[in-house]
A protein has these predicted regions:
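C-terminal segment of N-terminal export signals and the immediately downstream linker at the start
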Residues: 22-59
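N-terminal export signals
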Residues: 5-27
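Acidic/His metal-coordination segments adjacent to aromatic residues that form catalytic metal sites
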Residues: 58-62, 101-106, 202-203
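All-alpha RGS (Regulator of G-protein Signaling) helical domain and cognate RGS-like helical scaffolds
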Residues: 42-46, 74, 80, 84-94, ...
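Short His/Asp/Glu-rich catalytic/ion-coordination signatures at enzyme active sites or charged loops
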Residues: 51-75
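An amphipathic alpha-helical core segment
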Residues: 163-166, 171-227, 235-241
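Low-complexity, Gly/Ser/Thr/Pro-rich intrinsically disordered linker/tail segments
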Residues: 244-249
Length: 251
């Protein structure tokens, strides 16, 4: 699915977000198997594990190599494998991961957990960087303007993200989300487990939208290096955000 593919599904078809590239295509998430011309088989094996875009040790000392190898090569790979297995009991449609997630209901446990796990991790890897270039470390252009308008400053945004991570009980994710009805508005949200703001049939309407930054606060993301010091991990990893990539994910 190319970067000019459009999405119109459920709550994601809000004003200003109709003619925008799919987030999942930008992340390299792939798409579900699609039907052959005879409708009896699939033309693809399903979703695939995206490359990191950097070496496993490239985020050290913020995230250690062992954690990265386990997190990407085992946890994320496991979500992809289980997602493809779960899709075997559903009619192949060739739809994007975004469309799949937006159509889920609370009864779709396997697709919810593993589809969410795949998308969430793909986004996480996309917005991390080992680089220290100023252009990547500081929001610029339209993103900077929207952060200023929505939060007052970049520092206030980072404080909001850290606070949301600290208040998330147990496992989950923290998000910077673009409002579906007011694209100029950004807000911070948090979801449990592998839920995300794309799941319009599951998450509360107040946190639905287009996720442009995701922060993993499951213990497997940090425990080897930080043990129970989640706040230390959060503050450190926020210094490895590639704001240029975040900007590219906006509608």
């Amino acid at each position: 699915m190319d970067k000019r593919t459009f999405l119109k599904v459920g709550g994601l078809a809000g004003a200003g977000l109709l003619a925008t590239p799919l987030v999942s295509s930008l992340l390299g998430c792939g798409s579900a198997p699609g039907p052959n011309t005879n409708g009896s088989e699939t033309t693809a094996s399903g979703f695939t594990l995206p490359e990191l875009g950097f070496a496993y040790d490239a985020l050290e000392p913020v995230v250690d190599e062992k954690t990265m190898r386990i997190h990407h090569g085992k946890h994320h790979a496991g979500y992809v494998r289980k997602l493809n297995n779960a899709l075997k009991t559903h009619t192949p449609s060739g739809q994007s991961l975004e469309a799949l997630l937006a159509a889920l209901t609370p009864k779709d446990t396997g697709l919810r957990n593993n589809g969410g796990g795949h998308f969430n991790h793909a986004l996480f890897w996309k917005v991390l960087t080992p680089a220290t270039e100023q252009s990547q470390q500081v929001p610029a252009g339209t993103l900077a303007e929207r952060i200023q308008a929505s939060f007052g400053s970049q520092e206030a945004l980072l404080q909001n993200l850290a606070a949301a991570a600290g208040s998330r009980f147990g496992s989950g994710w923290v998000w910077l989300v673009q409002d579906v009805n007011r694209p100029e508005k950004l807000f911070v949200a948090s979801t449990p487990n592998q839920d995300n703001p794309l799941m319009t049939g599951i998450v509360d309407a107040s946190i639905q939208g287009r996720p442009i930054l995701g922060l993993d606060v499951w213990e497997h993301a940090y425990y080897l290096n930080y043990q129970n010091r989640r706040s230390d991990y959060v503050n450190a990893v926020l210094n490895r955000v590639n704001w240029s990539e975040v900007a590219d994910l906006m509608a």
